[in-house]
Amino acid sequence: WARRCGEESGMMSVDMGGPVNKAAYVFGTASIAAGNYNIMAAVMIGGMVPPIAIALATIFFKNKFTAEERKAGPTNFIMGLSFITEGAIPFAASDPLHVLPACVVGSAVAGGLSMAFGCTLMAPHGGIFVVPTIGNPLMYLVALVIGSFIACGLLGLLKKKVSE
């Protein structure tokens, strides 16, 4: 199950709001209807990681982003914490070969950890605003932090320095 949820979480990062992302989201919401709440927890965390990781990377790896990207980076904290994956799209569009793999790995790790920690979610959306509805919320936040920092670290390793 943890591997499967890691896959669903990774799918949330593949196209950042596109059809693969939506397929994972629909699977998560259908799981709620079926009474399986851990899949939705993994799906939501997978959608939260990319924008949070990008926001972190624009702070820790400033030389890997343009001035415009660094300025836009912190907005992704708010979007990520709100489960709005689409904040990561401009960053993924400008460097898909480096941004997407980093985000997919971070999301998959976060989702797998969420599942391994037994986290559940009965709400289909909401990010940090639905933390009170999350089963095992502390470990959910731990999984979110770990996945976000893994993706952030990979962004620092994979992205090339930007010359302005």
Predicted regions and their residues:
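Short, small-residue-biased leader/transition segments that mark boundaries at the very start
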Residues: W1-G6
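Pore-lining transmembrane helices
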Residues: E7-S163
